[in-house]
Amino acid sequence: MSRRHSAEKREVLPDPKFKDIIVTKFMNQIMRDGKKSVAERIVYGAFDLVETRAKKNPVEVFHNALEAVAPAVEVRSRRVGGATYQVPVEVRTERRQALAIRWLAAAAAGRNENTMRERLAGELMDASQGRGNAVKKREDTHRMADANKAFAHYRW
C-alpha cells in the first residue's frame, strides 16, 4: 500500500430506475465477474418481490434494512506489549454503509431460497423488521465491542 498517494474515491452514478446512489453501491456488491446487467436484474427483481409481498416502497424497505444492519461500533486488533487486544472503536459513516451493504449481500447469499432475487427480497424484508442473519451479524459485532469495553482506552 502506497504511503504517498491514496486512491481517489470514484464517483458512483445513481441507478437508472430509482436514481439512488446507495442502490447502485448495493448492485455493485451483488455483481459478480463484472456482470452489471445480471446484478441489476437480481436487485430490481428482488425490489419487485418486496413491493408485491410487503406492499411498501422497496427503496424505503431497502434503506430501513441498511439502517438496521449498519454497525455503530466494531472491534479492531491492537497489539500492546506482546498481547493483542480487541479494542472497540466507532465506525465512520462511510464504513457503516459499506459494511451494511456487504453484510446484507452475504446474508442473502447464505439463505436457502431458490433464486438470488428471492433470497435478497427475503433478507431485505427480514432486516427491515430487525430479523435475519445480517442483523444478527450487527448484534454480534456490538456484543464483541461491549465485551471488550475495558480496552477502550487503547483506542487510536
Swiss-Prot record:
GO cellular component terms given for this protein: small ribosomal subunit
Signal sequence coordinates: none
Stored Gene3D superfamilies: Ribosomal protein S7 domain (1.10.455.10)
Keywords: Ribonucleoprotein, Ribosomal protein, RNA-binding, rRNA-binding, tRNA-binding
Claim: Ribosomal protein is one of the keywords in the record: yes
GO molecular function, one term: tRNA binding
GO biological process, one term: translation
Keyword Ribosomal protein on entry: yes
Family of the protein in this entry: Belongs to the universal ribosomal protein uS7 family.
Subunit structure, as described in the record: Part of the 30S ribosomal subunit. Contacts proteins S9 and S11.
Cited function: One of the primary rRNA binding proteins, it binds directly to 16S rRNA where it nucleates assembly of the head domain of the 30S subunit. Is located at the subunit interface close to the decoding center, probably blocks exit of the E-site tRNA.
Name of this protein: Small ribosomal subunit protein uS7
Gene that this polypeptide is encoded by: rpsG
